Amino acid sequence: MEPAALPTESFELIVVGGGHAGCEAALTAARLGISTALFSLNLDRIAWQPCNPAVGGPAKSQLVHEVDALGGVIGRLADATALQKRVLNASRGPAVWALRAQTDKRQYARQMLQLLQHTPNLALREAMVTGLETSGSAESGDLRITGVRTYFGSIYNAQAVVLTTGTFLGGRIWVGNQSMPAGRAGEQPAEGLTEALQALGFATDRLKTGTPARVDRRSVALETLEEQPSDAHERWFSFDPEAWVSSEPMSCHITRTTAATHQLIKDNLHLTPIYGGFIDSKGPRYCPSIEDKIVRFADKDSHQIFLEPEGRDTPELYIQGFSTGLPERLQLKLLRTLPGLEQCVMLRPAYNVEYDYLPATQLLPSLQTKRVAGLFSAGQLNGTTGYEEAAAQGLVAGLNAVRLIRGQTPVHFPREGSYIGTLIDDLVTKDLREPYRVLTSRSEYRLVLRGDNADRRLTPLARELGLIDARRWQIYERKQEGIAAETKRLETVRLKVSDPVAPAVVEQTGAAIKGSITLADLLRRPGFHSNDLVRHGLADGELPVDVREGAEIDVKYSGYLARQTQQIERVQRQGQRLIPSGIDFYSITTLSREARERLTAAQPLNLGQASRLPGVSPADVTALLLWLELQDRQAATTTLARP
């Protein structure tokens, strides 16, 4: 009998994969004092941004703020490496404000690698993990991870393992009808790990995503295109001023598809992997290829395309909104149908990548797998898309792996408390069969779950868990004290109709002042903001912007916030609310069509079960709760009316 192989090394935690999920998981564990090893196929591609070199955007920026509030690093690095920043949806309410940063992808990766290399308790290893070492058995209910095995036969012991393999499991890239094994362009896929998971009883499936071509900016007539500069007032992802690094911004540019673009695509749809039938994996709904846009939105004669720089020391431009599966020989011709790109040089072709993933219904809310104790999964492996979603999952998986190792209870993030909670709740309860991205519409609590208050919601928890240090805690306390003081001032200081600035305020707001008015009530008037108070000499312009805006939001939306907080508490209480049998869900017109179908088929016993059905959104659950309460009131009224 051959003796068991001796382990090459032993760690408390092993993280497999060096993308955005893996980096957050490894850093979280190491900072909590756990002996951690991060394994990557290529240490020169740590935290690489293979698709859009950008961080943030709608709902994604809220995730980044939340990760930062919990001590994560994606926001700090985005602030340090930003080429430009813009606040999206700035004309709308604070619930949907979204900071987006175009980042220098090479600088981002370099800074992450340096951070990993200088973090105590963290080791980096370049190797392909192909197997999972376990003890016990599924039959006896004590199946547990004990380590990993690499391609060349080395065994590394660990008490817990976090898998963050991205698009590398069974990865295959496609350009037209040509394909090759790869996790992304120029990098080999991971072999063996999918089979190792399947051997342990896990179900796996395939997804796909894509990335557009890159062109040489020196070959593009940028001067003929609409310029999109950075916002004049710089905003930050991180709540830590030490992470704020200002640098000369770079502009993006905008072009549009033409009739020639659309015709070329229509004539060659059969040559793309999806429409040609070469692959049938589902791609991301909210990041469609240009051929998908033209097929799905046939009534539109043009689509907006953004030209975005990839870094300060590279001429490459990322062609956002123009991913394609067309053959390489047609891609340059397609690019040259765009205004400003008539003479462009294509440096890298667009491609699709198909990969294995682990449906996340096989996970607990801690992101530990249900089948194997000590085995966690995070990031694109769980069926998500986006660096931000990956970073959030990585932090949660790393944190809970530490707590498992130490015999502590896992930390669960409820969906009503954060977008992180919304993300994880959707992943582990809904049968998702396409790449998942976070959206503000996925949360019924978006007015409460804003980016600006992520620290208020999560930093006390981070302090309790040891994720942030005393300096960060002091920064948090100073900010909250400042907001409380300014809110109190706004609620008590009054502007009198006889005050010198009153006429200017009345002219701006278009509403008279009857005697006097508090500054808080002024802010509640449409179109009047804290900047206006400063302009009229009614607020201190030296007060930090985050303090002024935090106080403004608290007073301006106090009624809405109170109602949403009550709604959160009501839904929490009603999780076990029984649903009477025999309900005709089709008669409840406030439910979506899909929710009516799912509820009718499943006949859930309570609201908690209803909320976990695929296709039943949080808004549907709220609508069902309100309908049940209405039935209760009507029944009570009927009872009272009886003689």
UniProtKB/Swiss-Prot annotation:
Signal peptide: none annotated. Its cofactor is FAD. One of its GO terms (molecular function) is flavin adenine dinucleotide binding. It is found in: Cytoplasm. SUPFAM superfamilies: FAD/NAD(P)-binding domain. FAD binds at residues 17-22. PROSITE patterns: GIDA_1, GIDA_2. InterPro entries: FAD/NAD-bd_sf, GIDA_C_N, MnmG, MnmG-rel, MnmG-rel_CS, MnmG_C, MnmG_C_subdom, MnmG_C_subdom_sf. NAD(+) binds at residues 283-297. NAD-binding protein involved in the addition of a carboxymethylaminomethyl (cmnm) group at the wobble position (U34) of certain tRNAs, forming tRNA-cmnm(5)s(2)U34. Belongs to the MnmG family. Homodimer. Heterotetramer of two MnmE and two MnmG subunits. This is tRNA uridine 5-carboxymethylaminomethyl modification enzyme MnmG. It comes from Synechococcus sp. (strain RCC307).
